[in-house]
């Protein structure tokens, strides 16, 4: 858990200092992996589901970001943020796709990144409250460096070197379309994926609970059964019959007390 939180904060802080767009995406990937580690080692249903879902989200969002950065480098032959400006005016479709992917990476509600990070934070809050609070600052830092990079690259006046920036081709769109579709789908309706992983998550939590001293708050424990008034009254009735002067009453009470024992032996 500690290493996961360190990865979240370290990746986010270093990403805010990057002037290279590809390196910025790479360090944001470190922060995403920190959320995955935090969710898994929280050992709660929400944490494990969030960690596994965030693993899928990481492949979709970060993979799409690396593809888009590669397309920028192919067109401009540079990764320096300072050399990229005003691309939204010359390639609006490219900017729109980049916007969706970037917002999913920072965890905007309605996209896949929000569901995974929310489950991780909720699950880890149950067992590691202060670590979850510290990890939540990574979400704020992600919004800081990703929005800053987007503003520098796609807004502002178009440089002369960027006026010839080409729009997305149909081949590039065919590659990015499935990724964007899954990003939106998992953000709106993650239930099929969560239900699919639920049995494995439950078995893992039970295994950890049975073979270690860790007690997961996700495991429901049966409450102790209280003795009923009828069960408490039977010994008292036997004692009263034993104290009675009538031998018949004593024999009847003794037979009634021994009947359950004989039935259990059979």
Language model regions located:
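Cytoplasmic/organellar membrane-interface segments at the starts of transmembrane helices
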Residues: 91-94, 146-234, 239-266
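Hydrophobic transmembrane alpha-helices and their helix-loop junctions in integral membrane proteins
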Residues: 1-149
